């Protein structure tokens, strides 16, 4: 298959369309830069949109609480003011600096060119840890779920949630008032989730099965109909009827090809200085993918790092530009 080529050279290309990448792209527009975003998923929003769109976030400044998808939608609206070029479903495989100082970015579908690059790829590419039962894959896309995009699809249904971390407990609590019944199964006696959430779980109508694991899936072409649970210590088995199974065993993340781009990597993160500069001039990193002394991995911190990365890229392209931008209230 031939790879397309976009010969336009952008001022800045943002790799990763999560919250930090989206805000970086907006800020690039604010600083009158020509911006492109390349995102591997089919939609913007990163893990917020892919993993927990229905969950509330409580540590974004100015929002007492905001649903993850609502935050993504607000970022999209903010971004739309400057109409950046957005390339979805593309994974950057190679990043090369050319003789003229510009960068060539090769994805699985297209070749791109840019004067600077900002990497905001979060934890890198991520895949869910799947249910290790031979027949599980045949139910994916039916009623076996690793991602949840709409809680209402479980209304009035008998739901089994597998896992013992924050996601499993949080989804169980959110499903309780909607589903006909919710059962959570965890292989250990104690949950790893936040203490307050576990307390809520124990006081809810959610049926808790510990220490059990799903041992067998019984179903047909339409999906899973029953799940056989096995007691981890005693080996006793019981079968429960289900309409849907949600697996929250966490995710496996990897920097993937980024490790081969010549960047200084420390503990699966890209090392940057206070200007968000990497060891490659013209390449910057922001958000969860970067690290420096005192780094905290929060969306709120990524929102602060994005304008620094953009302003650094701006002065790299134009040394006469000011690092300190004008206040946005004076621009519109």
UniProtKB/Swiss-Prot annotation:
Q: Say which domain of life the source belongs to.
A: Bacteria
The UniProt entry, under Gene3D superfamilies, shows:
FAD/NAD(P)-binding domain
**Keywords from the named record:** FAD, Flavoprotein, NADP, Oxidoreductase
Query: Which reaction(s) does its UniProt entry say it catalyses?
Result: 2 reduced [2Fe-2S]-[ferredoxin] + NADP(+) + H(+) = 2 oxidized [2Fe-2S]-[ferredoxin] + NADPH
State the InterPro entries in the record: FAD/NAD-bd_sf, FAD/NAD-binding_dom, Fd--NADP_Rdtase_type_2, Ferredoxin-NADP_redctase_2
Q: Which cofactor does it need?
A: FAD
Q: What is its EC number?
A: 1.18.1.2
Question: Bound how, and how many: what does the cofactor note say?
Answer: Binds 1 FAD per subunit.
Q: Which GO terms describe its molecular function?
A: ferredoxin-NADP+ reductase activity; flavin adenine dinucleotide binding; NADP binding
Top-level EC class: oxidoreductase
Q: Does the keyword Ribosomal protein apply?
A: no
Per its UniProt record, what SUPFAM superfamilies does this chain match? FAD/NAD(P)-binding domain
Q: Where does FAD bind?
A: 20, 39, 47, 52, 92, 126, 288, 329
Q: Which family does it belong to?
A: Belongs to the ferredoxin--NADP reductase type 2 family.
- HAMAP family linked to this entry: FENR2
Q: How does it assemble?
A: Homodimer.
- Protein name (Swiss-Prot/TrEMBL): Ferredoxin--NADP reductase
């Amino acid at each position: 298959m031939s790879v397309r080529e976009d010969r336009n050279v952008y001022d800045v290309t943002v790799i990763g369309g999560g919250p930090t990448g989206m805000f970086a792209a907006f800020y690039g527009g604010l600083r009158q830069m020509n911006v492109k975003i390349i995102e591997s998923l089919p939609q913007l929003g990163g893990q917020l949109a892919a993993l927990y769109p229905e969950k509330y976030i409580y540590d974004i400044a100015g929002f007492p609480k905001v649903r993850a998808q609502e935050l993504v939608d607000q970022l999209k609206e903010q971004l739309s003011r400057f109409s950046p070029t957005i390339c979805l479903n593309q994974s950057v495989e190679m990043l090369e600096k050319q003789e003229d100082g510009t960068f060539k970015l090769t994805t699985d579908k297209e070749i791109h060119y840019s004067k600077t690059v900002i990497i905001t790829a979060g934890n890198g590419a991520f895949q869910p840890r799947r249910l290790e039962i031979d027949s599980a894959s045949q139910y994916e896309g039916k009623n076996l779920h690793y991602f949840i995009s709409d809680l209402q699809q479980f209304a009035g249904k008998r739901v089994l949630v597998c896992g013992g971390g924050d996601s499993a407990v949080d989804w169980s609590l959110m499903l309780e008032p909607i589903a006909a019944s919710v059962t959570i199964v965890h292989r250990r006696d104690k949950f790893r989730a936040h203490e307050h959430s576990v307390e809520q779980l124990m006081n809810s109508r959610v049926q808790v099965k510990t220490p059990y694991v799903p041992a067998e899936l019984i179903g047909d072409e339409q999906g899973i109909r029953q799940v056989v649970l096995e007691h981890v210590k005693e080996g006793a088995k019981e079968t429960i009827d289900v309409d849907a199974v949600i697996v929250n065993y966490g995710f496996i993340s990897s920097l993937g090809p980024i490790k081969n781009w010549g960047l200084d990597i420390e503990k699966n993160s890209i090392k940057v200085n206070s200007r968000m500069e990497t060891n490659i001039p013209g390449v910057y990193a922001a958000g969860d993918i970067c690290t420096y002394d005192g780094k905290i991995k929060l969306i709120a911190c990524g929102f602060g790092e994005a304008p620094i990365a953009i302003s650094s890229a701006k002065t790299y392209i134009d040394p006469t530009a000011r690092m300190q931008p004008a206040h946005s209230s004076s621009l519109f």
